C-alpha cells in the first residue's frame, strides 16, 4: 500500500458473502473458508501513543477484540527487519499474533524484507544487508524469515498465510531484485528463498505472492506471465485495491476500478490457476457509505467465485485526525459504516 500507517484493522469483514442471498432462493457458494480481516499492524504503536478504541455502544475495547466483535476472523501483520523504533519487528509481531490467536482469529504474516515500508515505488534493502551479493542476500532473507516464524511457532502461534514480499509488482530488494520488462533480476531467487523458509517452519502455511493495483489486468498479466515462465512457485495470489485513491485533489468514483477488479478475478484464475485474496483494501475515510458500498459490491459479485478467498481492510483503525492516514474506517475511535459488511 502506499501508505503511512495505521494499524488496526477492523477487518471485521467476516463471512459476509456467505450470509447473503444471491438472487431469489439461491444459496451463496463463496469459498467455505472465506475470511474477512484487517491489517492491524499499528495497533501496539497506537496503544503506546495513548489511542483508545470503542464499540458502537461507546464501550472501550482492545483493538483486536473489537475486530472480532464486529465480525472479523483474521488479521494481517507486517514484519520489518530492523525497524528503528521496534514496531513491526519480530517481538512486536509475536505480541499481536498472540492476541489474535487467543481470540480465534487466523493470522497472515506480511514480510516486507526492509527496515521500513516496501511497496511498488520503493523496495529498500535492509541496512544490514546492503553490502551483500545476491547469494548472501537470499540467505539473509531466508534466515530472517525463519527467525520470525520460529518465534511465532515457539510462542504456540499458528500461521495460515505468509506473504513473501509486499506489493512486489516491481520486484523487491532493489536493485538486484528489481523486476522490469523481460527481466526478473534476482527476484525469483529471493522469493524462493523465502518460500522454502516458510515451508520449513510451517509446512501447511500458504505462501502469497502480493501485487498492487488489482484492477490493472495488463500489468498483472505481464508480471504473472513473466513469473510463470521463470517457474515461480507460490500458493495464493494476493492483490491490493484502493479504488478511490486521491487524484488531482479529489477522490475519484470507486466503481470503475472496483468493477475491473471483480472482472479480473476469473481471468487471473483461468490464466494462472491460483486462488486470490484481496490482502489490502482501502477507501477514503471521509466517505464511509461509499466504502461500505464498494465492499458490498465486491462481496455480491464474487459470491460464486470459490477461488476468491477473502478480504483484508488495511489499517481501518487509523484516522486522519489521529495519524494522518486518510483511508481508514474509524471515526473518534469507533468503526464507521465502512465496516458494516463485516457483521452481516
Residue ranges and their predicted role:
Residues 41-43, 80-82, 112-116, 164-169, ...:
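Active-site beta-loop-alpha junctions enriched in small/polar residues
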Residues 28-106, 112-141, 147, 251-252:
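N-terminal substrate-binding region of glycoside hydrolase catalytic domains
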Residues 15-18:
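C-terminal motif of bacterial Sec signal peptides marking the signal peptidase cleavage site
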Amino acid at each position: 500500500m502506499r501508505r503511512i500507517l495505521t494499524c488496526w484493522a477492523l477487518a471485521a469483514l467476516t463471512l459476509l458473502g456467505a450470509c447473503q442471498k444471491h438472487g431469489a432462493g439461491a444459496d451463496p457458494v463463496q469459498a467455505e473458508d472465506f475470511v474477512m480481516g484487517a491489517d492491524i499492524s499499528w495497533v501496539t504503536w497506537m496503544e503506546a501513543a495513548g489511542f483508545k478504541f470503542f464499540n458502537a455502544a461507546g464501550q472501550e475495547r482492545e483493538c483486536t477484540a473489537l475486530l472480532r466483535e464486529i465480525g472479523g476472523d483474521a488479521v494481517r501483520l507486517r514484519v520489518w527487519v530492523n525497524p528503528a523504533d521496534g514496531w513491526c519487528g519480530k517481538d512486536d509481531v509475536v505480541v499481536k499474533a498472540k492476541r489474535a490467536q487467543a481470540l480465534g482469529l487466523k493470522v497472515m504474516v506480511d514480510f516486507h524484507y526492509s527496515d521500513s515500508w516496501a511497496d511498488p515505488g520503493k523496495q529498500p534493502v535492509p541496512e544490514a544487508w546492503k553490502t551483500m551479493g545476491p547469494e548472501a542476500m537470499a540467505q539473509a532473507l531466508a534466515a530472517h524469515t525463519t527467525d520470525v516464524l520460529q518465534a511465532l511457532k515457539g510462542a504456540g502461534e499458528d500461521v495460515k498465510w505468509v506473504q513473501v514480499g509486499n506489493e512486489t509488482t516491481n520486484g523487491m530488494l532493489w536493485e538486484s531484485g528489481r523486476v522490469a520488462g523481460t527481466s526478473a533480476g534476482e527476484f525469483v531467487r529471493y522469493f524462493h528463498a523465502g518460500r522454502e523458509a516458510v515451508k520449513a517452519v510451517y509446512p501447511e502455511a500458504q505462501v502469497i505472492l502480493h501485487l498492487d493495483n488489482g484492477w490493472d489486468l495488463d500489468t498483472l498479466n505481464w508480471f504473472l506471465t513473466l513469473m510463470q515462465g521463470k517457474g515461480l512457485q507460490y500458493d495464493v495470489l494476493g492483490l491490493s485495491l484502493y479504488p478511490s485513491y486521491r487524484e488531482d485533489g479529489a477522490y475519484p468514483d470507486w466503481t470503475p476500478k472496483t468493477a475491473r477488479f471483480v472482472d479480473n478475478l476469473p481471468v487471473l484464475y483461468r490464466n494462472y490457476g491460483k486462488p486470490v485474496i484481496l490482502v489490502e483494501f482501502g477507501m477514503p475515510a471521509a466517505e464511509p457509505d461509499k466504502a461500505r458500498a464498494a465492499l458490498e459490491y465486491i462481496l455480491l459479485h464474487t459470491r460464486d467465485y470459490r477461488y476468491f478467498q477473502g478480504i483484508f481492510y488495511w489499517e481501518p483503525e487509523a484516522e486522519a485526525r489521529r495519524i494522518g492516514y486518510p483511508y481508514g474506517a474509524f471515526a473518534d475511535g469507533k468503526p464507521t459504516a465502512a465496516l458494516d459488511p463485516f457483521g452481516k
